[in-house]
């Protein structure tokens, strides 16, 4: 699957939205990628995650585990793991706390794991997920995502491979361009932020 193929999947699913959006990072953007419109379709999800699995194999080789941040990363993590023939586990947080492996999940010594995200904007969730894995005995070889909307600038502290890399401008609330500021903002994402 090429980056253009992935974007066509988003368009066909009605998941490539234009307007004024407050992202889960708190930044504002004229473009929102509504990944749940992709993930609500099992066939489409399997197709895009198989594409990501191919990119992971090319970059990192064989992996035993896919680790994703809950909640948004669980579906693409699971489907990507299935395409890789790997196990899927996830990190989650107690309210207000850091991500951690729970439910008996671990990265055993000798295993190779990749962290899989859906969409990377600033890389915050990915960095937090990777931090939760640092003390595991197995090796975390890197990270992967369907779309890196930072244009390749997000620093995860680990290698990142994306099925598509886009350079979509994002703005702090106090630095909006006039055309974006003229449109009422909506918050379609999952992480609570204060509109501004």
Curated annotation (Swiss-Prot):
Pfam family, one: Pribosyltran
Binding site for orotate: 121, 149
Top-level taxonomic group: Bacteria
Known cofactor(s): Mg(2+)
E.C. no: 2.4.2.10
Keyword list, A-Z: Glycosyltransferase, Magnesium, Pyrimidine biosynthesis, Transferase
Residues bound to 5-phospho-alpha-D-ribose 1-diphosphate: 117-125
SUPFAM superfamilies linked: PRTase-like
GO biological process: 'de novo' UMP biosynthetic process; pyrimidine nucleobase biosynthetic process
Catalytic activity annotation: orotidine 5'-phosphate + diphosphate = orotate + 5-phospho-alpha-D-ribose 1-diphosphate
A GO term for molecular function: magnesium ion binding
Annotated pathway: Pyrimidine metabolism; UMP biosynthesis via de novo pathway; UMP from orotate: step 1/2
Enzyme class: transferase
Nucleotide-binding listed as a keyword: no
Coiled coil: none
Family designation: Belongs to the purine/pyrimidine phosphoribosyltransferase family. PyrE subfamily.
PANTHER family the UniProt entry points to: OROTATE PHOSPHORIBOSYLTRANSFERASE, URIDINE 5'-MONOPHOSPHATE SYNTHASE
Primary role: Catalyzes the transfer of a ribosyl phosphate group from 5-phosphoribose 1-diphosphate to orotate, leading to the formation of orotidine monophosphate (OMP).
Assembly mode: Homodimer.
UniProt name for this protein: Orotate phosphoribosyltransferase
Organism encoding this protein: Methylobacterium sp. (strain 4-46)
Source taxonomy: Bacteria, Pseudomonadati, Pseudomonadota, Alphaproteobacteria, Hyphomicrobiales
Gene (name only): pyrE
């Amino acid at each position: 699957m090429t980056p253009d193929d992935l974007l066509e999947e988003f368009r066909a699913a009605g998941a490539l939205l234009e307007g004024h959006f407050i992202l889960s990072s708190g930044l504002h953007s004229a473009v929102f990628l509504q990944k749940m419109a992709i993930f609500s379709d099992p066939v489409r999800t399997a197709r895009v995650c198989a594409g990501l699995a191919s990119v992971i194999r090319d970059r990192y080789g064989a992996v035993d585990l896919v680790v994703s941040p809950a909640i948004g990363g669980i579906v693409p993590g699971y489907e990507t793991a299935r395409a890789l023939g790997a196990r899927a586990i996830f990190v989650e947080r107690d309210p207000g706390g850091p991500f951690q492996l729970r439910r008996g999940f671990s990265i055993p010594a000798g295993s190779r794991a990749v962290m899989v995200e859906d969409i990377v904007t600033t890389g915050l969730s990915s960095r937090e997920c990777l931090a939760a894995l640092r003390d595991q005995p197995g090796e975390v070889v890197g990270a992967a995502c369907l779309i890196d909307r930072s244009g390749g600038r997000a620093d995860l502290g680990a290698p990142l491979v994306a099925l598509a890399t886009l350079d979509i401008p994002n703005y702090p609330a106090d630095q909006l361009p006039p055309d974006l500021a003229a449109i009422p903002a909506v918050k379609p994402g999952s992480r609570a932020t204060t509109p501004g």
